[in-house]
């Protein structure tokens, strides 16, 4: 571009053409800048709209981490022989620390598989009706449930671990949850511990996962397997705690020693707080 003017085919463009060329380039640059600014404004408007929409959305309330009890409330203990050994220690702590009364209906050899032997959903429904001050139910069962059981609709037995078995079993769990909800009662539910015999342990691992998934956000859940094994991933009669060997399990590989019962009782108490009037 000699002498400041553009050259085309070796010849300098006339001054008028040069000016037109510069004007066209300036217009193109202005259009590009206008497009850039428009895109920037649109992006800023989109971000502002998204921020406003987020502010308008109600925040999801934070779920309480503990069951809350007040003076005059009653705690209801339910479950099988696993609960039978644990409940008395919790009852004692509730009474001594907070003056809270309790009802303990835990019963050995019971579960949800055979309501003809003992009907937990019905028993719980009746107990709530008879005791309107119950504000917390603590549940610990399942060890007696890994069996095929009769189909309430008739026909062949429902096979353990099948979808049909799960559906009916969880229907019974739901009856318990519904009874508690209807009476404004909170629920603490204990998961299944490791068991010494592999077959039973496999069955308990299945039930533990079933409970944990179904009860999520519905109860205060206490996993017991890792607790009783001091974080281990399998059954252990005894564990090392603070440099000492402590036996948490009984010789049958199912139930708990007194120390194990106290450990679970402490875990339950840690899920409870007392609100001053």
Q: Which sequence ranges carry the predicted segments?
A:
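Sec-exported extracytoplasmic/periplasmic mature domains
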Residues: 83, 91, 95, 99, ...
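Hydrophobic/aromatic beta-strand patches that form the interior of the parallel beta-sheet core
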Residues: 138, 188-190, 220-222
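N-terminal secretory targeting modules
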Residues: 1-74
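Stable alpha-helical elements in mature extracytoplasmic
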Residues: 82, 86, 90, 120-124, ...
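A short acidic, glycine-rich active-site loop
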Residues: 158-170, 249-254
């Amino acid at each position: 571009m000699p002498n400041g003017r553009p050259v085309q085919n070796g010849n300098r463009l006339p001054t008028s053409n040069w000016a037109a060329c510069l004007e066209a380039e300036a217009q193109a640059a202005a259009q590009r800048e206008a497009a850039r600014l428009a895109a920037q404004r649109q992006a800023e408007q989109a971000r502002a709209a998204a921020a406003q929409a987020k502010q308008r959305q109600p925040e999801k309330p934070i779920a309480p981490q503990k069951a809350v009890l007040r003076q005059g409330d009653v705690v209801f203990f339910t479950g099988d022989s696993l609960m039978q050994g644990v409940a008395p220690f919790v009852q004692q702590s509730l009474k001594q620390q907070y003056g809270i009364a309790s009802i303990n209906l835990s019963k050995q050899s019971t579960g949800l598989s055979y309501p003809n032997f003992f009907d937990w959903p019905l028993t719980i429904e009746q107990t709530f009706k008879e005791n309107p001050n119950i504000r917390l139910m603590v549940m610990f069962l399942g060890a007696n449930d890994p069996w095929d059981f009769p189909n309430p609709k008739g026909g062949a037995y429902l096979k353990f671990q099948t979808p049909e078995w799960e559906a009916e079993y969880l229907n019974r769990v739901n009856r318990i949850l519904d009874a508690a909800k209807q009476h404004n009662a909170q629920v603490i539910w204990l998961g299944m511990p490791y068991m010494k015999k592999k077959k039973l342990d496999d069955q308990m691992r299945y039930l533990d996962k079933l409970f944990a998934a179904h009860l999520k956000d519905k109860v205060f859940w206490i996993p017991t397997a890792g607790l009783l094994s001091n974080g281990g991933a399998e059954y252990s009669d005894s564990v090392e705690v603070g440099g000492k060997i402590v036996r948490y399990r009984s010789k049958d590989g199912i139930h708990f020693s007194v120390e194990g019962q106290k450990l679970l009782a402490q875990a339950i108490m840690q899920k409870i707080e007392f609100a001053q009037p």
